[in-house]
Amino acid sequence: MNGGLLVAGTTSDAGKSVVTAGICRWLVRQGVKVAPFKAQNMSLNSFVTRDGAEIGRAQAMQAQACRVEPTAHMNPVLLKPGGERSSQVVLLGRPVGEMSARGYHGGRQERLLGTVLDSLAELRGTYDAVICEGAGSPAEINLRRTDIVNMGIARGAGLPVLVVGDIDRGGVFASFFGTVALLAPEDQALVAGFLVNKFRGDVSLLEPGLDMLHGLTGRRTYGVLPFRHGLGIDEEDGLRVSLRGTVRESVVAPPVGEDVLRVAVCAVPLMSNFTDVDALAAEPGVVVRFVDRPEELADADLVIVPGTRGTVRALEWLRERGLADAIARRAAERRPVLGICGGYQLLGEHIEDEVESRAGHVDGLGLLPVRVRFDREKTLTRAVGEALGEPVEGYEIHHGVAEVTGGAPFLDGCRVGRTWGTHWHGSLESDGFRRAFLREVAAAAGRRFVPAPDTSFAALREEQLDRLGDLIEHHADTDALWRLIESGAPQGLPFIPPGAPA
């Protein structure tokens, strides 16, 4: 078998990432050696591979679904937004510079097609099947000429295309039809059919519409996936990241102790790796809320200032909203505060930034004895250490170099009183350390909260991935899906007018 498939979507957040992961997990359970691939990802949620390459966090999650180690070839182009109109371009795991959207789509993107096709060929030469994820919609007619992630990669590699639509939003039939009808004939010939995502109710009520869609397009529907809570793992930061006010709470089990523990995460601009708090939200009795007002910190037992692609901008935002003063008051009252990566940097005394914001000298919040200087060379590394008497693993992704001048050691950073800071993403996924940290927070907050002794974040993640595989196995036509991956799109698929504009 030397198969492949592109999972496209009618919109951003249609479910491409989780459907791709589900197909990967289903295939690996059939004994197929499979890998994920996304030619170009725009995300602030990233991950560091074992050899120090930066890729999208979603592709790392999909690699886990495949039970393989993630590599840079699985996400050769990563765009990390730094503002409304520019992004850092990460090529094969290494940053190569900042670029405006106009500059990127004006020619640079098209020149990267060869690079992404080479990465895909590398994977296809190693694995039995490669399941590719598209981005946004393949029918973005203004971007088709320079597309390297949807029909550009499908046509370049001869991949069949499965279009995913989120029926929970409404309008899925128009979205399916319109997506195909706006593609050029050569692109339409690769679109094999559709997959309905997030359906609620009786599937028999949907079947007449699916039959009509087949009559209109000549393309079949490969499955109807039911709506399932708790499967938005390692989400990208498109539509889902309107996080202000969002609550993440464990659905695993009730609290072990008498009290819950309330965690407030400051929803700073350009928030990166907000998945850091998923391990907290998986703990029974921990309620995580994303906040943007100082009064929302009042009843929080722990405040987290998360990572951000714009440390200085986040610092300004905290000050403008009154959150900086509220955090400083908490620290003075010895109420728990945790800064991660950019959040750690802004808790320090001084920031010198001629790289990210080019703001030069900026005063931090002064809560930790740390001085930060931004370096053009990005730190990308896996980290292993110990804190609170427990082993910890994490990873670092940052331009800021921190000089710690005091306080008590805490991972790579420090702590003063009940204020902690570290560059390490992912540290809270280490179960023993997470429990020890939550015990400290609960004691400082006066809460009768007890961490569950047996919560394994890695095991919960595996359960989630298995549930995604189950969705495909039980609710998709897996025989037809297998043929599609192995043999490509059916021959003779009809053209749906009007096609792509000239």
Curated annotation (Swiss-Prot):
Similarity remark: Belongs to the CobB/CobQ family. CobQ subfamily.
Ranges of residues in domain GATase cobBQ-type: 260-433
Protein name: Cobyric acid synthase
GO MF term (any one): ABC-type vitamin B12 transporter activity
SUPFAM superfamilies registered for this protein in UniProt: Class I glutamine amidotransferase-like (SSF52317), P-loop containing nucleoside triphosphate hydrolases (SSF52540)
One biological process term in Gene Ontology: cobalamin biosynthetic process
Protein keywords: Cobalamin biosynthesis, Glutamine amidotransferase
Record-linked HAMAP family: CobQ
PROSITE patterns membership: GATASE_COBBQ
Gene: cobQ
Metabolic or biological pathway, per its Swiss-Prot or TrEMBL entry: Cofactor biosynthesis; adenosylcobalamin biosynthesis
Chain's role: Catalyzes amidations at positions B, D, E, and G on adenosylcobyrinic A,C-diamide. NH(2) groups are provided by glutamine, and one molecule of ATP is hydrogenolyzed for each amidation.
Catalytic residues (UniProt): 341, 425
